[in-house]
Design a protein with these regions (language model features):
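Hydrophobic/small residue at the entry helix of a nucleotide-binding pocket
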Residues: 142
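Phosphate-coordination loops involved in phosphoryl transfer and adenosine-cofactor binding
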Residues: 51, 130-133, 207, 216
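An N-terminal-biased, well-structured beta-alpha scaffold segment characteristic
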Residues: 1-77, 186, 206, 212
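Conserved N-terminal Rossmann-fold NAD(P)-binding element of oxidoreductases
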Residues: 135-138
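Rossmann-like adenosine-cofactor binding region
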Residues: 39-42, 163-261
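Rossmann-like dinucleotide-binding domain for NAD(H)/NADP(H)
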Residues: 72, 76-77, 207, 216, ...
């Protein structure tokens, strides 16, 4: 970045507060935020006249008010297509780790310094994955990649999406489309949340909808925390009305609800610090995307990954 541009970097990689972000926006021609940097309408209103591009280091742009940026003549870009496989891998990791109690078992060995009582018929019993019904909420690139992996593990694939996928994809995955999200939730053993975070998907998995799930079912979320009513999810797990959850994202991250931490200690949930895309290869690909978008913009071309307000 420094070789190509007069770049001012967040050297210690700390999470910038709002005054720091606004100060950068007043001086910069191009801003490169991460998904935890909130670029809301108030911040955009205070941007300097030279700021013309916000090149987000991330696929999701729910941290940016894209409409407000457009009104100020500021282009927004993201880094699509490079995180699909990494995020799908993490989804499968959570999908396996919760029913099979993998983290609980690993923690037990660590706490006992490798000592355990030995095998017995009822030792660390979890739930079988093979043959279970997986309901995918959001059958885009990531949802489809999750489905391909899950099919190889013997799960039957079901999905809810704004639009039905092609007959070829349905045939390949032997996938069943559900027009009604409510009806799908009530029939699945595992729900995987893979849709984008938009105003329309805020609390898409509401208290009412989560309550439709079977008490033996699990929820997995590697998309965005705001899509699920987190408090409702916690209450149902606490009450034994839902078997558990695997979460890589949280409604108020980076803060994690203390009640979720308590459930994790009991082995009811597996919690990860939003690391679904955290691979060396993925980060390099994201950085390359950011630079390609900046160079195109600086050279007077339309950036290839421009985000339009009506697409958010």
């Amino acid at each position: 970045m420094r070789e190509l541009f007069d770049a001012r970097l967040n050297i210690d990689d700390h999470r910038m507060n709002q005054p720091e972000i606004i100060a950068a926006m007043k001086e910069a021609d191009v801003l490169v935020p991460c998904i935890t940097d909130v670029i809301d309408a108030a911040a955009i209103e205070q941007a300097g006249p030279n700021l013309k591009l916000i090149a987000n280091f991330g696929n999701g742009v729910d941290n940016i008010d894209v409409a407000a940026a457009a009104k100020r003549g500021i282009t927004v870009t993201n880094t699509p297509n490079v995180l699909t496989e990494d995020t799908a891998d993490m989804t499968l990791a959570l999908l396996l780790s919760v029913p099979r109690r993998l983290v609980e078992g690993a923690n037990m060995l660590g706490e006992r310094h490798g000592q355990w009582p030995g095998w017995s018929p009822t030792w660390m019993l979890g739930r079988r994955i093979w043959g279970k019904r997986l309901g995918i909420v959001g059958m885009g690139r990531i949802g489809t990649a999750v489905a391909r992996r899950a099919k190889a593990f013997g799960l039957s694939i079901h999905y809810h999406n704004r639009k039905r996928v092609s007959p070829q994809v349905e045939e390949e995955l032997e996938a069943t489309y559900w027009d009604s999200l409510d009806q799908m939730l009530a029939r699945m053993d595992i729900i995987s949340v893979n849709c984008p975070s938009t105003p329309a998907t805020f609390h898409l998995l509401s208290a009412r909808r989560i309550a439709l799930m079977q008490p033996t079912a699990y929820m997995v979320n590697t998309a965005r925390g705001q899509i699920i009513d987190e408090n409702a999810l916690i209450e149902l797990i606490e009450q034994g009305k839902l078997a558990g959850a695997g979460l890589d994202v949280f409604e108020n991250e980076p803060a994690v609800n203390p009640r979720l931490l308590a459930l994790a200690e009991k082995g009811k949930v597996v919690l990860l610090p939003h690391m679904g895309s955290a691979t060396m290869e993925g980060r390099i690909d994201m950085g390359d995307k950011v630079i390609i978008n900046i160079r195109a913009f600086v050279d007077g071309h339309r950036p290839p990954d421009r985000v339009l307000p009506n697409r958010v």
